[in-house]
């Protein structure tokens, strides 16, 4: 497991790379909803912590949060609540990869900083399920994020 500082740097660097790609390839008028699983979930949430005005919502599946103890790695944390960005956070109750305290800490932080919907799935390990995808579909429709695709 990387040190706390290393984790901050790694997640922030990955989020910066995704954010730069989005900036260079997706028109600013298009809604962007990052979705990530595990470390990808941490990166998806971190995009909000860096550039919340660019992202319409986030879906974090069995992810965690970078601690943001290194100055400058999460520059928008202090203003994130102003945006009320919808976040879906789902995880398996039997996840043996991400410690429960990390999942609960992520849920608590997201509850405080975003418009959070969280759901845990009985019997699900560090994985995703059809039930979870069904719930995400409903959540996208509820928040008018479907754009006619669903």
Model-derived features with residue positions:
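C-terminal catalytic histidine-bearing segment of alpha/beta-hydrolase fold enzymes
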Residues: 101-150
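Short beta-strand/loop motif that positions the catalytic acidic residue
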Residues: 83, 88-91, 95
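Active-site signature of alpha/beta-hydrolase-fold catalytic machinery across serine-
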Residues: 46-50
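Conserved serine/cysteine hydrolase catalytic core
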Residues: 66-86
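Acidic catalytic loop of the alpha/beta-hydrolase fold
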Residues: 67, 93-98, 125-127
């Amino acid at each position: 497991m990387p040190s706390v500082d290393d984790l901050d740097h790694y997640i922030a660097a990955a989020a910066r790379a995704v954010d730069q790609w989005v900036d260079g390839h997706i028109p600013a008028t298009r809604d962007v909803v990052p979705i990530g699983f595990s470390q990808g979930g941490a990166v998806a949430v971190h995009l909000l912590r860096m550039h919340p005005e660019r992202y319409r919502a986030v879906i974090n599946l069995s992810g965690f949060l970078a601690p943001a103890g290194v100055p400058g790695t999460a520059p928008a944390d202090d203003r994130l609540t102003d945006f009320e960005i919808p976040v879906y956070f789902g995880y398996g109750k039997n996840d043996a990869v991400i410690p429960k305290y990390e999942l609960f800490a992520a849920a608590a932080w997201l509850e405080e900083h975003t418009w959070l919907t969280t759901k845990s799935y009985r019997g699900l390990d560090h994985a995703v399920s059809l039930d979870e995808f069904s719930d995400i579909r409903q959540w996208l429709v509820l928040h008018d994020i479907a754009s006619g695709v669903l």
